[in-house]
UniProtKB/Swiss-Prot annotation:
One of its GO terms (molecular function) is DNA binding. The keyword DNA-binding applies. Keywords: DNA-binding, Virion. Self-assembles to form a helical, filamentous nucleocapsid mesuring 1980 nm in length and 24 nm in width. Together with capsid protein 1, wraps arounds the DNA and maintains it in an A-form. Capsid proteins probably maintain the DNA in A-form by non-specific desolvation and specific coordination of the DNA phosphate groups by positively charged residues. This certainly protects the viral DNA under conditions such as the extreme desiccation of its host. The lineage of its organism: Viruses, Adnaviria, Zilligvirae, Taleaviricota, Tokiviricetes. This is Major capsid protein 2. One of its GO terms (cellular component) is helical viral capsid. Its main location: virion. The gene is SIFV0035.
């Protein structure tokens, strides 16, 4: 099962904070290079902005990691190759953002259908053959073919995410 309590080290958070400070100084420096160097108020504003950006990054990290862990687990269960796992991770993150974190974008059914359409566009590559729009045949590591209904996989990802956050 995916771990809910994935934590970042304080060193990671500090590195990210310093990165944001340097990026914000660089951006502001292109506009007003001389006024930054002598004005402590601008430096405080940059520090506050960087702190806010770091907080947003930290709060978005855990749900994103949770979505990726759920997809890895379900992909392993169905022997889905890595070429398709990236799309499934994007799907899980979108479901998480729109329905669990309440960003409220497109409806869940629409997200589901859009990702099925996107999967249909990627028929070449890792799949051996496609018997229907949503049914894929993949080759396992031992060489045996496995048939997977991608609509069922997407539904299982949705259910696992909703179960993990108890919504």
């Amino acid at each position: 099962m995916a771990r809910r309590n994935r934590r970042l080290s304080s060193a990671s958070v500090y590195r990210y904070y310093l990165k944001r400070i340097s990026m914000n100084i660089g951006t502001t420096g292109h506009v007003n290079g001389l006024s930054i160097a002598g004005n402590p108020e601008i430096m405080r504003a940059i520090a506050r902005l960087s702190e806010q950006e770091t907080y947003n990054w930290v709060t978005d990290y855990a749900p994103s990691h949770l979505a990726k862990e759920v997809v890895k687990q379900i992909s392993g269960k169905y022997n889905i190759p890595g070429a398709y796992q990236g799309l499934l991770m994007a799907f899980a993150e979108k479901v998480l953002a729109n329905y669990i974190l309440d960003y409220k974008g497109e409806p869940l059914v629409e997200i589901h259908h859009n990702f099925l359409w996107e999967l249909m566009q990627r028929q070449s590559g890792a799949g051996l053959g496609v018997t229907s729009g949503f049914i894929y045949t993949f080759v396992r590591k031992d060489g045996k073919p496995v048939t997977v209904d991608m609509s069922k996989v997407l539904t299982e990802i949705e259910d696992a995410l909703f179960k993990l956050v108890k919504k």
